[in-house]
């Protein structure tokens, strides 16, 4: 009853935007907790290329000053562009996607963000135990990861690849839940 509620609709970034808003709220109200939900139904037309990736599900996360599972860092890099690779118009129950173009954009965005992150913070692959991905389908993230793996040592490549495979287990079962797929990983 005495709660704030906001709904964001953005397939790739909605849950992450919710987490960013929650971090700001926690900074101002350190004793509070914020519930962030990422949920969706990905539905594509019968016989379309996207049909095999569809799914439905949700993730729920409680954001607080004292996290128990995952601590969020303040360092970040991001990229926004108006890319017509995927969309679900208000008038349609099914989404539309240009799969090849979408893959190209996903990989390009990942590489661009990685290059920016390295430039800002001097990061290398050795600095990461694992990298989580937004996964419209599970091979998509690996295609992006492969673009940067050669920058690391053999140990880095093995560690990040192994953790990537582990992170896809639930996504393979559930299918694409859009914004929640990153946190399902």
Indicate where each model-derived feature is located:
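Flexible, glycine-rich active-site loops centered on histidine and acidic residues
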Residues: 27-60
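Phosphate/pyrophosphate-binding loops at sites that engage ATP/ADP/AMP, CoA/4′-phosphopantetheine
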Residues: 111-129
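Membrane-interfacial loop- and helix-cap regions that link adjacent transmembrane helices
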Residues: 119, 130, 135-136, 141-162
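Active-site pocket-shaping loop/turn-to-helix segments
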Residues: 6-16, 50-52, 93-112, 173-177
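Condensing-enzyme catalytic core mediating Claisen C-C bond formation in acyl metabolism
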Residues: 47-108
């Amino acid at each position: 009853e005495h709660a704030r509620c906001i709904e964001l609709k953005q397939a790739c970034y909605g849950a992450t935007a919710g987490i960013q808003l929650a971090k700001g709220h926690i900074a101002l109200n350190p004793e509070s907790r914020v519930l962030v939900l990422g949920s969706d139904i990905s539905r594509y037309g019968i016989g379309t290329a996207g049909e095999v990736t569809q799914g439905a599900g949700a993730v729920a996360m409680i954001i607080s000053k004292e996290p128990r599972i995952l601590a969020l860092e303040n360092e970040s890099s991001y990229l926004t562009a108006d890319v017509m690779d995927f969309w679900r118009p208000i008038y349609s129950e099914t989404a539309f996607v240009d799969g090849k173009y979408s893959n190209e954009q996903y990989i390009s965005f990942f590489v661009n963000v990685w290059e920016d992150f390295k430039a800002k913070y001097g990061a290398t692959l050795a600095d990461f135990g694992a990298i989580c991905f937004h996964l419209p389908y599970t091979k998509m993230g690996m295609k992006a990861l492969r673009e940067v793996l050669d920058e690391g040592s053999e140990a880095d490549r093995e560690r990040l690849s192994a953790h990537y495979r582990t992170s896809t287990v639930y996504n393979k079962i559930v299918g694409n839940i859009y914004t929640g797929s990153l946190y399902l990983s």
